């Protein structure tokens, strides 16, 4: 059985790009819709990526899969909506941003020693596309990076908070 990374698709325009980048690392990936997340982790799945979305976690009908069987068992990467969903789910605060960010931004890494930023240069150019922003991180998470416009550009679970790390961008 081939090990893989599961990509949970919330309807982002770039989910296929995420899968391609994972494949370029010679890692098999599979994209599934957010509502098809298995209740138990399949033995061949070694990590989970939560994609972005055109929707907001603040919406009454926000897309909210149950991650309880997954958190702490395998590494999780939240991207855009995925990052906002993780923050919201664990008690953080997400709000509509008064500084909508779309396009290139410079990343200010606040914790360069964190393994998530291994090989990433200070001031790296990144792509941002979102209308919501994370105002407050949940307990058990730490801020890793910001941009000039957005105070929470990357964050992660604190070491030991979960058995397996959650990182979000």
Predicted regions span which residues?
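Pocket-forming structural segment of enzyme catalytic cores
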Residues: 63-79, 84-169
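Flexible gly/pro-rich beta->alpha loop and the following alpha-helix that scaffold active-site loops
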Residues: 2-7, 12-79, 84, 90
